[in-house]
Amino acid sequence: MNTYIKIDEHGNMLFTENKQEGINSLIDNKQENRNLFIEKNKCDKIDYLISIVCGVIGGAIDVFLVGAPGNSKLGKWTDKQIDNVVMKFSKLNGWNPQEQNKNNVKSAIEYLEKKFKVNYDQSVSNSASAIGLTPNNHHMKSLAHSPDIIGLFFSILNQFTSTSTFLSDGRLITMDTYNQSLQGHNFISKLFCGVYNWIGHLMSDFAGSSSSKGRGKGLVMPFYELFNLCNFGKFNINDKKGTMADVAIKAFENGYDARFGITMAIPVVMTNLLIKLIWSLRRLIQFKAPIRECIPTSKHSDLRLMLLIGNGTLCFVDAMDATIRSGGNFL
């Protein structure tokens, strides 16, 4: 006796001894078959192809439009947007420039530097020189200049205790500074003023210094300062050997700051958006899935795999380009 598959109105597979009934059930329940296929969340060859193509597109954007700081087409656009943000923030805090300085970001930065002074902003002194602190790397080594929770903690600590805290050569170093009088009548108000002072000072450094030539040295990417702890390894840096911390510092000095970090994120965002868009359209148009099942969320294992493949392809293209450009140097 032969057994045939039958699918009921709910899309469940049953077994029947009637061959014609099983065949008719399969024919009459095409939508249930589609739903069964979708619910399995398995990638097919088209999904793999989509992921790879999207990754290559992201890689091409990275190679031809991102490039390196200083000659990046997307980087110039990103820098301009950051300049606009800094000028808008300055206006919100009282910057009222003359007509000739309305679009002058240096004027806006100078205003913020004067308004949001901090005690830990020294970059040149005898003590600073002893730990290798320079105007080019003090945003990297000074923990209070980091745009993350670590930076906030050390900024409040330094403002309340009149100190500066640095990471250098794998060591945590604290220096005494001049006394800074925080505004506010009690601890809570002083804490609030300290937080806002930190934000304002970060904005004054976001687009570089008012005295710097060119784009200047901005802020580090969030948690990038922790590379200062990596005082190990031997890597080629312009015909010299250096630790991982030295590589990170040199990269920051060469323009890999938070602004360029935003630029480098654009190919990643584009790759993810393309994969999610095509994945959603395919489910909606080809598989006739309900709209709620076409929303790209992490619960879909096939989408997670597609994103992994797409980003892996992007990283591979980027790594190949970096290897060719570097010629064996890490920078």
Tell me what each language-model feature is:
Residues 1-331:
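Glycine-rich, hydrophobic membrane-spanning regions of integral membrane proteins that mediate transport
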